[in-house]
Amino acid sequence: MRAKEAGILKDVELRLISELMKNSRRSDRELARALKVSQPTVTRTRCKLEKEGYLKEYTVIPDFAKLGFQLASFILIKGTKSRSAEVMEKARQITLKDMAERAPNEIVLFNRGMGGGYTGVIVSFHKSYSDYTELVGRMKQYPFVDTSATLSFLVDLNDRIQYRPFTFSTLAKHILTPQKQEKK
């Protein structure tokens, strides 16, 4: 269900998010022109969306290969069998502490999930294969990760054949597409 249909976002709010996902570098005046609303409306709406947490950050998608990164890795992990609330909270605290102290900056996503028997995913970028193996080695320090049961998918960022380059523009268009009515 689209956010607008759920009554969470107004049409102009959803369209503004879509425009920002396509290009967050545009001025409020340019966004107002694209949305066919006034510049103060865009400014007020953008500030509201920031305050309410709909807009977390403004960023760019660089050419990672030109920045010296060779690999993108998607690592599926399994948690250890003991998954009590206490163990999961301890795991979360260890992860947050490690992220704050050692700042493994190559990790762009580390989250719980499900599918194929796996319970989490790590998405990261690496300048070399040895950088990637160093991250995998650090994972052994996490007592809640079953390191004997991980699955890695590596993407060569220098590969000339790309079926769809990394972009949010397609998702920006998708959030404006009406969803099919569910059968009752």
PLM regions and their residue ranges:
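A compositional/biophysical signature of low hydrophobicity enriched in polar/charged and small residues
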Residues: 1-184
